[in-house]
């Protein structure tokens, strides 16, 4: 836990408790907003100042459960805001929002403590050069390339594969990524965090990774601050160590949801659909700190739960505006077994321009999108009249699109235990080569199943070419 030897002697008294909301009376000096206060018999209850009611009273939100708290109890001002541990010694460790180690090991030695509330980098410090960040996942690298130092969102409802895709990206990137990876779990299942820790440990990539959790069983105040704590750690590695950082957030919607709970507890007037009126400001305070500067880059990939698959929900709309790439997961594709269940027509990236990814990649991506869009339009005709009513040109479009859809499926390392299929990491050049050959009808005689759940296109060739040669020779 953070050092309180230099804590302020300022103290107050609890005068009202309403769930996680605590009103405190300070007879002398009023603590500033965002100050961390401690109370309870063993100073185990941590409270953050949310607003100042008058010259003697503050209204606070509890960051820990308030069991045992009573009116009249003494409250001490810690003398500053919530702090997070930073330094090389936090690598390979797992923390909660307060910087306590939760991996059943001794607390790290020699850590520094910094405020979780920091300002975004100045505009003059931001790097403007755009670079592509490869993931090893075919559909993402070809159609919606990610930006180094940018923010990508994984949008989807419940059970379409957001966490699996995020975990796969960690697996692929931590191995080839020279920097540091920080996983921030906001309001998600404790079980997933424990599984992720074991997987990363087994894969041997934990040495360059930090995990921070504020899970769904914790009070809204803790879930609301854990994202800021993870960002403080990321900023240390970027600004002090000059290393690139991969920040993975699961789930940014739970951050917004925690803010909504805090807003409701504080009695603020709700905005549309019950969201807090300060939704845009709160999200910007977090997102704007994720940036690419001259000293290094923080690249962020964020899972975004979409309530009831409604992409007009204010939480989804506000998150969209901060992202350089949006990866939309489709329940329909998941039901068809096309994993990763990414919708190629709804997903997009600001990086997909000729000046950044090159003319060949751009033209190929546009041709793939056009083919898949034409196939989507033809599906209604096929459903009503059958394939026989299509023209020869439309037949070719359907054949190419269906083979592209299957080629874009990919077995994941993180699902090997469920599917019994070894995971595949595919380079961008191999993915582009495969798409180009499919669009040139090189695989029109191959069954669609030959392209399903493979890595590079050469796997289909080596597996089915002997069979085709035997058929042709007969």
Swiss-Prot record:
Main location group: membrane
Top enzyme category: translocase
Pfam families: ATP-synt_ab (PF00006), ATP-synt_ab_N (PF02874), ATP-synt_VA_C (PF22919)
Keywords assigned by UniProt, alphabetized: ATP synthesis, ATP-binding, Cell inner membrane, Cell membrane, CF(1), Hydrogen ion transport, Ion transport, Membrane, Nucleotide-binding, Translocase, Transport
An example Gene Ontology molecular-function term: ATP binding
InterPro entries xrefs: AAA+_ATPase, Alt_ATPase_F1_bsu, ATP-synt_VA_C, ATP_synth_F1_bsu, ATPase_a/bsu_AS, ATPase_alpha/beta_chains, ATPase_F1/V1/A1_a/bsu_N, ATPase_F1/V1/A1_a/bsu_N_sf
Domain of life of the organism encoding this protein: Bacteria
Record bears the keyword Transcription regulation: no
Gene Ontology cellular component terms for the protein in this record: plasma membrane; proton-transporting ATP synthase complex
Gene3D superfamilies: 2.40.10.170, Bovine Mitochondrial F1-atpase, Atp Synthase Beta Chain, Chain D, domain 3 (1.10.1140.10), P-loop containing nucleotide triphosphate hydrolases (3.40.50.300)
EC number: 7.1.2.2
Secretion signal, residue range per the UniProt entry: none
Catalytic activity from the UniProt record: ATP + H2O + 4 H(+)(in) = ADP + phosphate + 5 H(+)(out)
Assembly description: F-type ATPases have 2 components, CF(1) - the catalytic core - and CF(0) - the membrane proton channel. CF(1) has five subunits: alpha(3), beta(3), gamma(1), delta(1), epsilon(1). CF(0) has three main subunits: a(1), b(2) and c(9-12). The alpha and beta chains form an alternating ring which encloses part of the gamma chain. CF(1) is attached to CF(0) by a central stalk formed by the gamma and epsilon chains, while a peripheral stalk is formed by the delta and b chains.
PANTHER family named among the record's database cross-references: ATP SYNTHASE, ATP SYNTHASE SUBUNIT BETA, MITOCHONDRIAL
Function: Produces ATP from ADP in the presence of a proton gradient across the membrane. The catalytic sites are hosted primarily by the beta subunits.
Family: Belongs to the ATPase alpha/beta chains family.
Protein name listed in UniProt: ATP synthase subunit beta 2
Lineage of the species this protein comes from: Bacteria, Pseudomonadati, Pseudomonadota, Gammaproteobacteria, Alteromonadales
